Amino acid sequence: MITIAESHPQIHHSPPDTTAPSTPPTATIFRSRLPDIVLSNHLPLHEYLFENTLTSPSPCIISASTGRSYSFAETHLLSRKTASFLSSRCGVRRGGVVMLLLHNCPEFVFSFLGSSMLGAVTTAANPFCTPQEIKKQLLASGATVIITQSAYASKISRDDDVEDLIVVTVSDNELERHAAPPEGCVSFSEVESADEDAVPDAVGVGPEDAVAMPFSSGTTGLPKGVVLTHKSMTSSVGQIVDGENPNLHLRKGEDVLLCVLPLFHIFSLNSVLLCGLRTGAAVVIMARFEMEGMLETIQRWGVSVAAVVPPLVLALAKNPLVEKYDMGTVRMVLSGAAPLGKELEAVLKGRLPQAVLGQGYGMTEAGPVISMSPGFAKQPTPVKSGSCGTVVRNAELKVMDPETGFSLGRNQPGEICVRGPQIMKGYLNDPEATSATIDVEGWLHTGDVGYVDDDDEVFIVDRVKELIKFKGFQVPPAELEALLLGHPSIADAAVIPQNDEVAGEVPVAFVVPSKSSDLTEEIVKEFISKQVVFYKRIHRVYFIHAIPKSPSGKILRKDLRAKVASFSS
């Protein structure tokens, strides 16, 4: 069995650049507007989450599809039963790895928490991944158990590489529940008869032990296992929701959080599920996104806090179905995972005037939250449109000049770097990638271009690798995308570089027209040309039915680049 204990990433750091000046400028370090707090990051994650909520009588987890709710005590009990099942039936021990190949469901919650109780590690994957992608993550992570819905069991390889693998299947409905599991699989229903008092003693699980291993987005390279420890995850949740004036104020026994974003993505896992568990708020779980189903869920359960990504903001802002439902209970809309344009913010605020709309910013490797709007705090402060808020408490942020490596001051764009107890331990078995991401001083280099303004607010300009170079000028795609979405006949858009013999690269746009629009390439080009400097003008427009995006809402630019390359060949 490959275990994290046996294969901790060794964090090697590159030697300092001896060509740099010996006396670089004094670094400008940015911190939160909110004061630091005492973090309870010495506790194992599962103990920390239930520390103040175990006796709460209010709902903890609600299944939108079945209507069943679980109290905090029931959630804890079923998680202990799952831990017992994983140990006695599947042989999982401290340091072992469990893979979750699940759509959002209560069993995801019980499996994640149960693994933590054993001192084991979970790695989650998208059930829509191909069998080859699933096998690649399975082998890379060293998982010995996969928990999945019955419909996806056939995707799991049973060749010699994974012959000892145990596949546990979750039933999607009552009919499946009473049927035998697929051949060679174990039914998750066995959890119900497991002895919750037979959980092996997990004493010795320390803050630096791994608890989760998400695989980082493959949008800029090959996916890599990100080792997040108990300390990483308790720190990140604490930075957001703990203290007398939490950055994200969730009300115990009152708030209902919408969990429609996939739990296999760190944004939903951290900022929805774990924050809800810690604060005593209810989490209503939707198996997958469907517009009318989401609106019905918000209305039925009185959702008060909606964590979304820009594509959902776009749907909430422009889809006429929204007008059919009562959205009056929504008091906060938190957008993350990808940049949100000012124009889209304004449209949504017009539709949900009672709600506070704001952004958070993060990345998997950062644990994940780096900054969050203080407009969500118990004692809120105003935030500018387009801002990602201020850096979270108990962390530091600096902006680095990519050319010189020197720290930059306010209002100067550069690479965002973050340091704090929440960042990853490293990439699994990849010391070279780890040392390229976390420097000798503990700064995690995000690869994102941004700046901090005079009010300590963080603004993201773009990804370093996504910047378009037009005759040496830098063109940020996110800026042009935000402008395009401001056109009433454009439903969605993405901008990427296209190679050009003269300019090197030119910006080209993929546009999804609104229904029954008369949009043409010239109309789009002219619309942008009126708003930008010459080198930011759109050179080509490709009309498309949908912009390809990851489950977290990030534009899959490499897919669009492949389309452009096919047009040229």
UniProtKB/Swiss-Prot annotation:
Region called Disordered, residue ranges: 1-24
Tissue spec: Mostly expressed in stems, and, to a lower extent, in bulbs.
Pfam families: AMP-binding (PF00501), AMP-binding_C (PF13193)
Pathway where it operates: Phytoalexin biosynthesis; 3,4',5-trihydroxystilbene biosynthesis; 3,4',5-trihydroxystilbene from trans-4-coumarate: step 1/2
GO molecular-function terms, A-Z: 4-coumarate-CoA ligase activity; ATP binding; trans-cinnamate-CoA ligase activity
Keyword Iron-sulfur: no
InterPro entries (alphabetical): AMP-bd_C, AMP-bd_C_sf, AMP-binding_CS, AMP-dep_synth/lig_dom, ANL_N_sf
Signal peptide interval: none
Thylakoid as UniProt keyword: no
Keywords for this protein: ATP-binding, Ligase, Nucleotide-binding, Phenylpropanoid metabolism
Region annotated SBD2, chain positions: 360-427
BP terms from Gene Ontology: phenylpropanoid metabolic process
Residues binding ATP, per UniProt: 216-220, 265, 337-339, 359-360, 364, 448, 463, 554
EC number: 6.2.1.12
Region (SBD1): 290-359
Similarity comment: Belongs to the ATP-dependent AMP-binding enzyme family.
PANTHER family registered for this protein in UniProt: 4-COUMARATE--COA LIGASE 3 (PTHR24096:SF169), LONG-CHAIN-FATTY-ACID--COA LIGASE (PTHR24096)
Function, in words: Produces CoA thioesters of a variety of hydroxy- and methoxy-substituted cinnamic acids, which are used to synthesize several phenylpropanoid-derived compounds, including anthocyanins, flavonoids, isoflavonoids, coumarins, lignin, suberin and wall-bound phenolics.
Record remark on domains: Both substrate-binding domains (SBD1 and SBD2) are involved in the substrate recognition, and are sufficient to confer the substrate specificity.
Protein name, as recorded: 4-coumarate-CoA ligase 2
Protein's organism: Narcissus pseudonarcissus (Daffodil)
